[in-house]
């Protein structure tokens, strides 16, 4: 960090332990690869009354990773990788744990980038039934479960958030959520909602909905930072695909 950020004496920095503790400090001395800082204040982040969980379907071209990155920068509290029926990517055997660690690393990097005190929790991979059980548990505890779906009658803008509890947001893969999956989630207590008139990619649908729920749509700087990487990586992916065709 000293080399990459070119930190100098007198600069103010934030140090976090990843569990909500934040130290405000001033750089006192720097050497190659190391620095000494004087801590001026230590605070502990208060857990929010309302938390947000993104159930993200596995997607090709690292679009799911892009969603994890942007959602983390926007403030998501937990991310659940979901093996949807139409997911092209498959997590099996040793690949499952390796892929999950990649999600964890992406979330940790985005946490540092956005100067969050706590990274989001990345759960183990779930299938339809496990996702439905998680939805049922969330609703039973007074939370809210929403499924992004282009044919939904309710609009995301009409959603009223609970005063406390978890808000679970389910995002499908490139091919969309199957009728069987949607029926299972609705039976578990989820509400299908549409974000708007346009259909977004799996990489951006979750973060866009999250920004709306968090009331960040008017904060152009926050949203622009979170989506800058999505636009860049999506463009690179499209170029690569075009080159292979």
Regions found by a protein language model. Give the residues of each.
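N-terminal positively charged helical leader segments and presequences
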Residues: 1-45, 94
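Residue-level signal for inorganic ion chemistry
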Residues: 10, 71, 107, 185, ...
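Gly/Ser/Thr-rich beta-alpha loop segments that engage phosphate groups in nucleotides
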Residues: 12, 63, 174-178, 198
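Short, ordered loop/turn segments at secondary-structure junctions
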Residues: 18, 42, 83-87, 174, ...
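RNA substrate-binding interface of SAM-dependent RNA methyltransferases
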Residues: 44-146
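Active-site/ligand-binding-proximal alpha/beta "capping" segment
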Residues: 142-182, 190-194
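Structured adenosyl-cofactor binding patch, chiefly the S-adenosyl-L-methionine
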Residues: 179-220
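Alpha-helix boundary/capping motif
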Residues: 220-222, 229, 235-241
């Amino acid at each position: 960090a000293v080399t990459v950020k070119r930190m100098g004496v007198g600069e103010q920095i934030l140090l976090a332990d990843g569990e909500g503790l934040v130290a405000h400090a001033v750089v006192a001395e720097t050497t190659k690869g190391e620095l000494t800082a004087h801590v001026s204040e230590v605070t502990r982040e208060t857990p929010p009354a309302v938390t947000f969980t993104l159930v993200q379907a596995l997607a090709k071209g690292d679009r799911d990773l892009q969603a994890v990155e942007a959602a983390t920068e926007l403030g998501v509290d937990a991310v659940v990788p979901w093996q949807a029926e139409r997911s092209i990517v498959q997590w099996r055997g040793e690949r499952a744990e390796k892929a999950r660690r990649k999600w964890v690393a992406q979330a940790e990097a985005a946490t540092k980038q956005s100067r969050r005190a706590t990274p989001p929790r990345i759960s183990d991979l779930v299938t339809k039934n496990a996702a439905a059980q998680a939805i049922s548990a969330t609703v039973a505890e007074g939370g809210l479960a929403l499924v992004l779906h282009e044919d939904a009658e309710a609009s995301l803008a009409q959603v009223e958030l609970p005063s406390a509890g978890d808000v679970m947001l389910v995002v499908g893969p490139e091919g969309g959520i199957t009728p069987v999956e949607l029926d299972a989630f609705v039976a578990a207590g989820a509400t299908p909602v549409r974000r708007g008139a346009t259909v977004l990619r799996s990489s951006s649908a979750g973060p866009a909905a999250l920004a709306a729920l968090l009331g960040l749509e008017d904060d152009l700087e926050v949203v622009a930072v979170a989506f800058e990487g999505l636009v860049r990586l999506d463009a690179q992916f499209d170029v690569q695909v075009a080159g292979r065709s």
